[in-house]
């Protein structure tokens, strides 16, 4: 069977990539006024479809990290990968530009500089490469 990725755009800079039973979620945000439609939101039922979820937070701005992501670990196996500029006490594996993390035999992540705060991420999952630029300031 041919491998495939399922990419879902949410809002602002947020999107997810599913590869088999792994879900990668980048800069998830419901919106300043919760404008992400209910039918597009990641729910506990969504998370339970995957054996592992990785949540990436590129930097500390509120529009790149909805607090709801920190409740997901109550219902699913979630690992957080966060920029080194996140406040002390933020849950997760911290990454600065130049860092590489091997999170499983199926997922490796490299952090690169951003044109604004934080980092950008290059994730290699199941042989596919996915780049998330983080915040763009140009």
Model-flagged regions — what are they?
Residues 114-138:
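Active-site-proximal loop/helix segments of hydrolase catalytic cores
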């Amino acid at each position: 069977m041919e491998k495939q990725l399922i990419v879902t755009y949410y809002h602002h800079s947020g999107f997810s990539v599913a590869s088999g039973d792994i879900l990668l979620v980048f800069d998830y945000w419901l919106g300043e006024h919760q404008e992400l439609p209910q039918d597009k939101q990641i729910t506990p039922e969504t998370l339970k479809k995957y054996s592992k979820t990785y949540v990436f937070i590129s930097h500390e701005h509120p529009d790149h990290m909805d607090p709801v992501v920190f409740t997901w670990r109550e219902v699913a196996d979630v690992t957080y990968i966060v920029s080194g500029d996140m406040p002390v006490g933020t849950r997760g594996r911290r990454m600065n530009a130049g860092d590489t993390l091997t999170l499983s035999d199926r997922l490796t992540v490299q952090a690169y500089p951003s044109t604004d705060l934080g980092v950008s991420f290059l994730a290699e999952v199941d042989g596919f490469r996915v780049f998330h630029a983080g915040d763009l300031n140009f």
